[in-house]
């Protein structure tokens, strides 16, 4: 950031700054790719959660959930890719693409469980997997469909690879039964939603995938 003269949180909100910071990270050999965005709150914020932009040191994070109960999921906003930080990301990818760099462009996506537990209060969300299983599946389907739209828009903007990070979707948190039922199912749905776009995909889940 200091070398580029571009810092957080400003780079989270401005497509030129986001693009140029990502490019600077590549050119200064911090990464072997050029990837945006720099946080995991874009999707949750677009669906109604409150997010603080953090600081030069700390990433943006959720400070208020859109709803407390999974029963309210039908009231959620759909992802509007024409405004807010979702648009900032898409515009940043277009800027990076226009530079014709000899590096893959990475579009970063937050995984279904992590988005779901950033939109609805996490402990209530996890409890609902057992108490209101059917509604959670309806909610997860909605969340995953919205993420697919965002991923495909990033590809259209110029992303070569989509990286899906789902740190809340671990076996340690959910247990093996719910990991299979809610993580594997909806990660696969997400991958199926972008598989015809002829781009690479990477899934990152903290912990053991079992």
Each PLM stretch: what is its role?
Residues 1, 32, 59, 80-210:
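Active-site loop segments of alpha/beta catalytic cores
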Residues 1-55, 91, 95, 138, ...:
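N-terminal basic, low-complexity leaders that serve as flexible interaction/assembly modules and, when applicable
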Residues 1-8, 48-50, 70-73, 112, ...:
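Generic secondary-structure boundary/loop-capping signal
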Residues 9-13, 61-64, 76-87:
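Short coil/turn segments at secondary-structure boundaries
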Residues 21-24, 65-70, 135-140, 193-195:
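Short C-terminal domain-edge/linker segments immediately following a structured domain
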Residues 40-79, 95, 102:
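A contiguous, low-structure linker/loop signature
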């Amino acid at each position: 950031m200091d070398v580029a003269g571009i810092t957080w949180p400003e780079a989270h909100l401005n497509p030129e700054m986001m693009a140029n910071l990502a490019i600077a990270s590549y050119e200064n050999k911090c990464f072997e790719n050029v990837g945006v965005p720099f946080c995991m709150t874009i999707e949750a914020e677009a669906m109604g959660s409150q997010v603080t932009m953090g600081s030069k040191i700390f990433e943006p994070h959720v400070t208020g959930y859109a709803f407390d109960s999974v029963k309210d999921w039908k009231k959620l906003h759909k992802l509007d890719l024409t405004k807010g930080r979702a648009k900032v990301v898409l515009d940043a990818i277009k800027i990076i693409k226009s530079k014709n760099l000899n590096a893959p462009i990475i579009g970063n996506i937050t995984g279904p469980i992590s988005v779901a537990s950033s939109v609805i209060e996490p402990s209530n969300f996890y409890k609902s997997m057992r108490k209101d299983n059917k509604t959670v599946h309806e909610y997860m389907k909605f969340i995953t469909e919205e993420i697919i739209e965002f991923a495909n828009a990033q590809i259209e903007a110029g992303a070569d690879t989509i990286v899906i990070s789902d740190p809340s979707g671990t076996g340690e948190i959910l247990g093996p039964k719910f990991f299979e039922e809610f993580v594997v199912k909806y990660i696969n749905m997400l991958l199926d939603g972008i598989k015809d776009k002829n781009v690479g995909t990477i899934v990152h889940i903290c912990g053991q995938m079992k």
